[in-house]
Amino acid sequence: MRARQFFISTLKEAPADAEVVSQKLMLRAGMIRKVAAGIYNYLPMGLKSIRKVENIIREEMNRAGALELTMPLVQPSELWQETGRWDKMGPEMLRFKDRHERDFALQPTSEEVVTDIARQELKSYRQLPKNFYQIQTKFRDERRPRFGVMRGREFTMKDAYSFDRSAEAAGESYDAMYAAYSRIFDRLGLTYRAVAADTGAIGGDRSHEFQVIADTGEDAIVYCPDSSYAANIELAEALSLLPARAGASAPLAKTPTPGKSTCEDVAALLGVPLASTVKSLVLATDDEDESGKVVKSTVWLLLVRGDHELNEVKAGKIEGLKAGFRFATEAEILDHFGCKPGYLGPIGLAQPVKVIADRTVANMADFVCGANAEDFHYTGANWGRDLPEPDLVADIRNVVEGDPSPDGKGKLAIQRGIEVGHVFYLGTKYSKAMNATFLDVDGKPKHFEMGCYGIGVTRILGAAIEQNHDERGIIWPASIAPFEVVICPVGWSKSEAVRDEAQKLYDALVAAGVDVILDDRDERPGVMFADWELIGVPHRVTIGDRGLKEGVAEYQGRRDPEASRVAVAEIAPHLISRLRP
């Protein structure tokens, strides 16, 4: 490819509304252009990288035995109504009516459609296992699309769905997809972690996220440097930081804390460690009658140490909270505690509440907590002596850096990550809802055991840039760069020798299967270099009259601090050996 044939449209500055590095650089590099909130044109430079990501995914999915198909972007409501998700999906699913007043939606995902395929086409256990995948446009009407392609409304996704005759066989399909995803992200050249993830309302214990490591990532990834343990912050188990409860050594005292309503302020006022305080969080659950009217509300008091944070996902797994909870209203808090938030605690309640203590809180002694009176806290509080034991002790907090690893092999560390892939064991959730069955070996109908496996194709571009960039621009891994090599001839229109050597190098690289672009725009060297550093091409070769007189060209890798001189005769073998080892 020659630059004059291609479409190069770089910007010196990013638009003012660009928020994150990847969004700014993709716009400046001429990869994307915004059409509407969360919707982008992918220009030729960006599409080249997308196609390379898709090709790697396609090769590894095929290698794993998955079969490619395409399902419609526009899907009828009837299938979604079978699973109940037509109403549950909320406004994120864009719905519309056709000219016949029939309801349709733009697909945010395709479990219903693929399950319909299976129930129509897979009649016998002899046809199993099967794994279908597509690389297709999705649309989710995000409330606040942001961060460019990282959280767009229209995006490209690879979604795969496995169908098996047993849970054991489904586990094998899951493992095969996990291995395929690992190969995909290895080939993409990204630093990533596969972490255990929460399974949400579906249940089960098979779910992993593939997270690209980046300081700007939205997700917290917990791992142990001394073992293979890794989980996202929602799932990572928090052990008690106190092996056992010490005996009481201080009397209970109602202590004035005027205007100090946070654990940090109370600890500073009293001159005690923040880890000696207890934080109170009040939740409520509602019982409804058949008409949906609330007939009873139950108030819950959850206690975590003052330097810890409540993990709402873990709280949602507690019996009684599984069906859903909310934070209590101020009226409910006044009714049960007799005071406003900021001074709440488990001692001297106005009305009974269910008390759940985090594992660490349950082992605390002589702790500080709210006194259920404005401007007062208790000091020297102890379980059993000053207040009843909690109704339940559970892991309800987020882990923090330095916590003991649940596998007992060291301490936990935390990184930031960007989720780009997810593998999930579904079980029979969809096959039962849609009565999708096959005839098993005994001749009886049986529901398919399913798994689903997603990769955000366009999101990978943003994640790769967030991980790989500098002040000059993008630093693409070679496997997904729009071009692997750029040849920059200095004096293209003026020197026949430069044109000849540039063309010879170009021809040699093309013959070796290298994706190379020859910059024949006749720009000044500084302009060419700035463009290609911004775009992020991994390898640059500069050919000029001065170097040719000495028989050398200038080579610079995108990550190299300085250029090096390489003999003209050696430059093609040098590049080919690096790119096609």
From Swiss-Prot:
- InterPro entries for this protein: aa-tRNA-synt_IIb, aa-tRNA-synth_II, aa-tRNA-synth_II/BPL/LPL, Anticodon-bd, Anticodon-bd_dom_sf, Pro-tRNA-ligase_IIa, Pro-tRNA-synth_IIa_bac-type, Pro-tRNA-Synthase_IIa_type1
Transmembrane residue ranges = none
- Principal place where this protein is found? cytoplasm
Reaction(s) catalysed by this chain, per the record, are: tRNA(Pro) + L-proline + ATP = L-prolyl-tRNA(Pro) + AMP + diphosphate
GO biological process terms on file: prolyl-tRNA aminoacylation
User: Which EC class, in a word?
Assistant: ligase
EC nos: 6.1.1.15
Record's keyword terms, sorted: Aminoacyl-tRNA synthetase, ATP-binding, Cytoplasm, Ligase, Nucleotide-binding, Protein biosynthesis
Lineage, top-rank taxon, reads: Bacteria
Instruction: Note the CDD domains from the entry.
Output: ProRS-INS, ProRS_anticodon_short, ProRS_core_prok
Q: Where in the cell is it found?
A: Cytoplasm
| Gene3D superfamilies cross-referenced by the UniProt entry | Anticodon-binding domain, Bira Bifunctional Protein, Domain 2, YbaK/aminoacyl-tRNA synthetase-associated domain
Provide any one GO MF term from the record.
ATP binding
Q: Cellular component GO terms, alphabetically?
A: cytosol
Reply yes or no: does the keyword Aminoacyl-tRNA synthetase apply.
yes
Tell me the protein family, please. Belongs to the class-II aminoacyl-tRNA synthetase family. ProS type 1 subfamily.
Q: How does it assemble?
A: Homodimer.
Function comment: Catalyzes the attachment of proline to tRNA(Pro) in a two-step reaction: proline is first activated by ATP to form Pro-AMP and then transferred to the acceptor end of tRNA(Pro). As ProRS can inadvertently accommodate and process non-cognate amino acids such as alanine and cysteine, to avoid such errors it has two additional distinct editing activities against alanine. One activity is designated as 'pretransfer' editing and involves the tRNA(Pro)-independent hydrolysis of activated Ala-AMP.
Q: What does the entry note on its domains?
A: Consists of three domains: the N-terminal catalytic domain, the editing domain and the C-terminal anticodon-binding domain.
Specify the protein name.
Proline--tRNA ligase
Q: In which organism is this protein found?
A: Azoarcus sp. (strain BH72)
